[in-house]
Design a protein with these regions (language model features):
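Walker A/P-loop NTP-binding motif
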Residues: 1-6
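Conserved inter-motif catalytic segment of the P-loop NTP-binding fold
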Residues: 7-144
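Phosphate-binding/switch region of NTP-binding enzymes
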Residues: 146-243
Length: 243
């Protein structure tokens, strides 16, 4: 996101982990200005239990050449969407869902196409697997892996297979990128006699659409073996081979 700002791109931070630290990002070179406002702070008397309120001037939000969403902001903007019918409801959800993220990305891409945004975009989502689908929300069963996978495949198909790649054409005035972090789980069934294999939450539809993937271990299965070499009595692993 620091490099994106330096290149004239707008970072669109979608923080469904609710863990993004602006101060840490600023220390790394990210440009953002704190906006201060009066915030009511509760004080509790430990002896009497009496609650009093005082006002302090604190950071309420951040401003700059970026767009930021967390779960609360997603619900505020898209929480009235009923994704099963495509209509809007009278009340807003307080739980963000996978479809909200796709709606967010499509809305911003629409604004760019309509001329309301005149810069390229870097979408950064942290992370797939941190929120469930609309179907899970309605059923009260957050954590249904198959429903999440189906929702990601359907909601993001046009984004990752058309809208983002189309911006790479020379005829496109702006170049857009989607970077995402994917939560994982360990599958013990694929390699019964060896270490568990790392699998992505939310299925593999995003994995198949990804142009570049960075994996952090957990890939050794029964169908893979390490290629090693020995030099001066030391063994070195230099590649893996599929059987």
């Amino acid at each position: 996101i620091v490099s994106a700002q330096k290149q004239g791109l707008i970072p669109v931070i979608i923080d469904t982990e609710n863990s993004f630290s602006f101060q840490y990002a600023i220390n790394m070179g990210f440009e953002a200005e704190p906006i201060y406002g009066d915030v009511e702070i509760e004080d509790v008397d430990e002896e009497t239990g009496e609650v009093s309120v005082h006002t302090e001037n604190r950071i309420t939000h951040w401003d700059g050449n970026f767009i930021y969403f967390n779960n609360a902001i997603l619900c505020e903007q898209f929480g009235d969407m009923d994704y099963s019918s495509g209509s809007k409801t009278k009340t807003k959800r307080k739980t963000a869902v996978i479809e909200d993220v796709a709606m967010c990305i499509n809305t911003i891409l629409d604004a760019q196409e309509n001329g309301d945004i005149d810069q390229g975009l870097l979408f950064v989502w942290d992370s797939i697997g941190s929120i469930g689908s609309y179907k899970e929300y309605k059923a009260g069963k957050i954590g249904n892996a198959m429903w999440s996978a189906a929702s990601i495949s359907q909601a993001f198909n046009n984004i990752v297979n058309d809208r983002i790649p189309a911006s790479r054409k020379v005829t496109s005035p702006y170049s857009n990128t989607l970077l995402y972090i994917n939560k994982v789980w360990m599958n013990n069934t694929l390699n019964p006699t060896g270490p568990a294999v790392m699998e992505t939450k939310g299925g593999k539809s995003m994995k198949y659409a990804t142009r570049m993937e960075i994996l952090m271990g957990g890939q050794l299965t029964a169908g893979i073996k390490r290629l090693t070499a020995t030099s001066k009595g030391l063994n070195y692993s230099y590649a893996i081979q599929t059987k």
